[in-house]
């Protein structure tokens, strides 16, 4: 019933792929970094380069859709993601703070695109997520990590960042791992009396290093 709609969406999405294999939020091949040197371009927002998290969303859909016509786009997108992986195994997150968000996004995309989840890049990402799990079983990351990646740790765990980490680990085949068990226990213990999760943190970047938003649904949806 929805086949034609899905086909049109997939074709349009594949057409938004940039030359380097990645996908951006709004534009194609908008990578002219010299534009950010224009006076008063203090947000660094005159370009829209491909990012790991947006690419992951697009590749996840195209991989799940699974049509042969889009396999080259999936291959190029996965290649982009592998090139973008940080030295510590994480991926940068443009639209959610930060490395936890980006790493979850890519791991889930890899699984949806039917990639080998034993790939070295995947295992490195898993090890990074496990390495930043907090003593209480949760995960947390502050916006300071946009200033210095070494600061990718919050003074407290958050429900939605814990959920991101868990989704990433489970996509990578870690469902029965001790890290996942501890993370789920944290979420159960952090549930409020109204049976939801409440978080005060502003962890949705408008422009990284400039300003951040708070999406009230994050802690409830994820």
Summary of predicted features, one role per range:
Residues 1-222:
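Preference for long, amphipathic alpha-helical scaffolds in soluble/luminal domains
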């Amino acid at each position: 019933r929805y086949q034609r709609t899905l086909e049109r969406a997939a074709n349009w999405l594949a057409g938004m792929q940039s030359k380097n294999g990645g996908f951006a939020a709004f534009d194609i091949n908008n990578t002219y970094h010299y534009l950010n040197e224009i006076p008063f371009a203090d947000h660094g927002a005159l370009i829209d380069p491909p990012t790991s998290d947006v690419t992951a969303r697009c590749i996840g859909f195209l991989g799940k859709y699974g049509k042969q016509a889009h396999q080259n786009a999936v291959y190029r997108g996965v290649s982009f993601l592998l090139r973008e992986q940080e030295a510590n195994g994480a991926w940068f997150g443009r639209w959610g703070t930060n490395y936890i968000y980006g790493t979850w996004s890519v791991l889930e995309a890899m699984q949806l695109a039917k990639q080998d989840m034993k790939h070295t890049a995947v295992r490195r990402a898993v090890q990074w997520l496990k390495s930043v799990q907090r003593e209480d079983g949760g995960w947390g990351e502050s916006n300071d990590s946009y200033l210095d990646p070494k600061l990718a740790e919050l003074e407290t765990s958050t429900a939605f960042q814990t959920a991101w980490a868990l989704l990433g680990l489970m996509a990578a085949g870690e469902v029965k791992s001790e890290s996942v068990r501890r993370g789920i226990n944290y979420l159960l213990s952090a549930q409020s009396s109204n049976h939801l999760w409440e978080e005060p943190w502003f962890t949705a970047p408008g422009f990284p290093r400039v300003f951040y938003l708070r999406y009230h649904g994050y802690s409830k949806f994820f």
